[in-house]
Amino acid sequence: MTDQLYLSLWLNRHSRATRLRHFEQLLKLFPFSQRDQPQSTVSIHAIDSTQPPLLEQALNGPLDPEAIAPILRDYQGDDIAYSIESWWDLWQFGDSDPKLAPARVTLSCFGPDFDDGLASGHEDLRMDFGVDTNFLPQPEVPGSAKFIESNVKSLLRLVHQMESALPVAHRKLETESGENFADRLQQLLKATIA
């Protein structure tokens, strides 16, 4: 069963007031794909995700965090959420041989009052890496182990880089169903080796 994979980051309490600056820093650190890719999208919502976006803008070519920052700064408030849907490079398996290609990623920043934020324990920053199968062993695909290992290393390197660069109080890498991704990965690795 495929599931969405997320990294949720909660900033130190005193850093929440500058969350947009930290989101811009996250964007500068993120390894966006430089390959040919579909459009990226920047979206800004107020109050909650059921409301129409205040802004939704398509962007062509590789994402440039420096070009996005002024757009984000035009919309500020505790009930604002910023979302960037873009691409990063992962090994992927289609009908042919594995290939390094752009994979969808969504990077988000949530104001403390967005979607009843703090009351619901909402994270400050989130990275949605798409389906977890890009990071899990695929025994039915011969030779996939080294490519999956490369994807997992890229993911872990990114997690540690974000933790080092941002004032993170707490982080959680999990699937949409709430399953702990590290536990699931470990179980599948044991089953693959056995």
Feature locations, PLM:
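Short, extreme N-terminal segment that most often corresponds to the first beta-strand
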Residues: 1-52
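Short, hydrophobic beta-strand segments
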Residues: 5-11, 56-59, 69-73, 125-141
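Alpha-helix boundary/N-cap detector
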Residues: 14-21, 63, 146, 150-153, ...
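Polar/charged, Gly/Pro-rich intrinsically disordered segments
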Residues: 19, 54-68, 179-194
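Conserved short hydrophobic interaction patches
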Residues: 26-33, 78, 158-161, 165, ...
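Short, intrinsically disordered low-complexity segments
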Residues: 32-111
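Amphipathic N-proximal alpha-helical interface segments
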Residues: 102-103, 108-127
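Acidic, proline/glycine-rich low-complexity IDRs
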Residues: 120-194
